[in-house]
């Protein structure tokens, strides 16, 4: 074997011996410290050891990004808050159109009122002509029914009228022409016997008694009726006679 051929082998042997000397030296140093350890060449890697015990429990982590749940039911209404401060005034609006003249409306309303009043007066005249009698500023109407005096008084009042009460001969004649049978007048002496007054309590100044009347022939003759000839008779208020009411025009 030539020198050049064996040179690599010699170098490898030298390196190996050097490494072995180094490891032997390290092992000797360890053996001096712990005599039970025997020095030798390094062994091959062993198989992996068993898993170690579980470590201590870590701190609680942050909530994860889970799926969003469904919306819950509405909560109870909270208490009413305190009133807020007034807002700032809004901008001034545009100028409006000129208003209409109210005088035209007033004149129109006055004209329409006059027309309605005229029509109402015409209707009154028709009613009086067909159903009643008009004299001066009074109109007399009858429903053709007979009833006691208090019922006559109530019925006339319901229609904003009064029991017919002639205040003069002209009104008495108008009543006579209207009725064909005995009718109550709005005159009584219920408060004071022999003192006949109208339903307002005012003494009557016009009277047209029949001969011998009033005679108070029977108890309770405190009312007055108009006879067919236009004269008056005192009679019991509980009796039933024709109803005649008067209305102011």
Swiss-Prot record:
GO terms for biological process: antiviral innate immune response; cell surface pattern recognition receptor signaling pathway; complement activation, classical pathway; complement activation, lectin pathway; defense response to Gram-positive bacterium; negative regulation of viral process; positive regulation of opsonization; positive regulation of phagocytosis. It is found in: Secreted. Residues 43-101 form the Collagen-like domain. Disulfide bonds join 156-245, 223-237. Residues 113-131 form a coiled coil. Residues 43-103 are annotated as: Disordered. Keywords: Calcium, Coiled coil, Collagen, Complement activation lectin pathway, Complement pathway, Disulfide bond, Hydroxylation, Immunity, Innate immunity, Lectin, Mannose-binding, Repeat, Secreted, Signal. Oligomeric complex of 3 or more homotrimers. Interacts with MASP1 and MASP2. Interacts with MEP1A and MEP1B and may inhibit their catalytic activity. This is Mannose-binding protein C. It comes from Bos taurus.
């Amino acid at each position: 074997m030539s020198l050049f051929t064996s040179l690599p082998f010699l170098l490898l042997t030298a390196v190996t011996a050097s490494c072995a000397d180094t490891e032997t030296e390290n092992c000797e140093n360890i053996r001096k410290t712990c005599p039970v350890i025997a020095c030798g060449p390094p062994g091959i890697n062993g198989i992996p050891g068993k898993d170690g015990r579980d470590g201590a429990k870590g701190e609680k982590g942050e909530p994860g990004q889970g799926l969003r749940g469904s919306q819950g039911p509405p909560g109870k209404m909270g208490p009413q808050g305190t009133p807020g401060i007034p807002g700032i005034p809004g901008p001034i609006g545009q100028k409006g159109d000129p208003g209409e003249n109210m005088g035209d409306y007033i004149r129109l309303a006055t004209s329409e009122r006059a027309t309605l009043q005229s029509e109402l007066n015409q209707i009154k005249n028709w009613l009086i002509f067909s159903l009643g009698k008009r004299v001066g500023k009074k109109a007399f109407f009858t429903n053709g029914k007979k009833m006691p005096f208090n019922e006559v008084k109530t019925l006339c009042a319901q229609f904003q009228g009064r029991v017919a009460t002639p205040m003069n001969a002209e009104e008495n004649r108008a009543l006579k022409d209207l009725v064909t049978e005995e009718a109550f007048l709005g005159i009584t002496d219920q408060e004071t016997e022999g003192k006949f007054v109208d339903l307002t309590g005012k003494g009557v100044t016009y009277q047209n008694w029949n001969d011998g009347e009033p005679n108070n022939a029977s108890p309770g003759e405190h009312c007055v009726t108009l006879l067919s000839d236009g004269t008056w008779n005192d009679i019991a208020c509980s009796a039933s006679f024709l109803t005649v009411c008067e209305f102011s025009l």
